[in-house]
Amino acid sequence: MPVLGAVPFLKPTPLQGPRNSPGRQRRHTLPASEFRCLSPEDAVSVFEIEREAFISVSGDCPLHLDEIRHFLTLCPELSLGWFEEGRLVAFIIGSLWDQDRLSQAALTLHNPRGTAVHIHVLAVHRTFRQQGKGSILMWRYLQYLRCLPCARRAVLMCEDFLVPFYEKCGFVAVGPCQVTVGTLAFTEMQHEVRGHAFMRRNSGC
């Protein structure tokens, strides 16, 4: 996953569901670059990217195919996909969590009353890595969360070698995570979302 020292300032645009009506665009024409929330129909493409990105590094995926479908059915508004000419090239999947720290249950639960957005996975297609897409997608996702009344903070867990990447995205390490997966241990990180009234007033939310 690439690490960027700075992310270009891109004005966030309203996120929409999949565009199924061909009348909204010219025939055979797809937008060069599009950001939108994901749907269960995107699950297979999501899993293919995730599997390739994580299996070789960690030996397992943060989310399996049935879990991806589960979250994209329950809370698609907490996902974000980056599409190039209709092809998924990077994505984030999140859910709501209602505790101060992550626990094992956070891996599979979505609590609609939660105020913490648990980011389960960020992954970029192998042919689009080393281009800064991971940092840009995370930046756009955090801007989007500021438009959601339910979101107060974003939380995630990652292996130690990814801590510098997420620090550059504005996350702060809060200590070792209680969650373990096999022999893997993680650092828990968070990013405050609340208190950004100025950003809300100027982001079209």
Curated annotation (Swiss-Prot):
Keywords: Acyltransferase, Biological rhythms, Cytoplasm, Melatonin biosynthesis, Phosphoprotein, Transferase. Its EC number is 2.3.1.87. The keyword Cytoplasm applies. It is found in: Cytoplasm. Residues 11-30 are annotated as: Disordered. The keyword Acyltransferase applies. Substrate binds at residues 122, 157. It is an enzyme of class 2 (transferase). One of its GO terms (biological process) is cellular response to cAMP. Expressed in follicular pineal cells and retinal photoreceptors with five times more expression in the pineal gland. The record marks 118, 120 as: Important for the catalytic mechanism. The modification Phosphothreonine is found at residue 29. Acetyl-CoA binds at residues 122-124, 130-135, 166-168. InterPro entries: Acyl_CoA_acyltransferase (IPR016181), GNAT_dom (IPR000182), SNAT-like (IPR051635). It catalyses: a 2-arylethylamine + acetyl-CoA = an N-acetyl-2-arylethylamine + CoA + H(+). GO terms for molecular function: aralkylamine N-acetyltransferase activity; arylamine N-acetyltransferase activity. Phosphorylated; cAMP-dependent phosphorylation on both N-terminal and C-terminal sites regulates AANAT activity through allowing interaction with 14-3-3 proteins and protecting the enzyme against proteasomal degradation. Induction: Exhibits circadian rhythm pattern in the pineal gland with highest levels at ZT 24. Expression in the retinal photoreceptor cells oscillates in a circadian manner. Belongs to the acetyltransferase family. AANAT subfamily. Monomer. Interacts with YWHAZ; the interaction requires phosphorylation on Thr-29, and modulates the enzymatic activity of AANAT through preventing dephosphorylation and/or proteolysis and stabilizing substrate binding. Subsequently, a second molecule of AANAT can bind, via the phosphorylated Ser-203 site, the other ywhaz monomer with similar effect. Catalyzes the N-acetylation of serotonin into N-acetylserotonin. This is Serotonin N-acetyltransferase. The lineage of its organism: Eukaryota, Metazoa, Chordata, Craniata, Vertebrata. The gene is AANAT.
